[in-house]
Amino acid sequence: MNVKIEPLPTFKREAKRLNKHYASFADDYERFINELEANPHLGTDLGGGLRKIRMAITSKGKGKSGGARVITFTVVVAVEESEINLLYIYDKAERSSISKKEIEELLRLNGLK
């Protein structure tokens, strides 16, 4: 399967903030992208093409459980081709979860709904 991964503006803004805060973030993000390319079905299925994936932040020293959460939205382009939109990322230490309403707003802000 051919997978294209596209970080959206709402994701980029939060990723930039986390990158300033955690020294290992750039390497952790690269590792996350490689894992996602190898297995596009990572994480928990939230329905409607949405997934929540745990991402470790090495400099926090807490593994995936205390790292970040990435919300993705997958669009199937063709039978063997899909696009994974990186919708949002948040630090698990800053917030425990994200509501369905917030996810819908993120989709709207990025022109996906």
What are the language-model segments listed below?
Residues H41-L87:
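Basic/aromatic recognition patch in beta-strand/loop cores that engages polyanionic ligands
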Residues S24-L42:
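Compact soluble domain cores
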Residues M1-Y29:
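Arg/Lys-rich, positively charged N-terminal/basic patches that mediate binding to nucleic acids
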Residues N2, K62-S65, I98:
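Residues at secondary-structure transition points
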Residues E14-H21, N39, A56, Y90-A93:
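Alpha-helix C-capping/helix-to-loop hinge sites
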Residues E6, S24-D28, D45, S82, ...:
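Alpha-helix N-cap and coil->helix boundary residues
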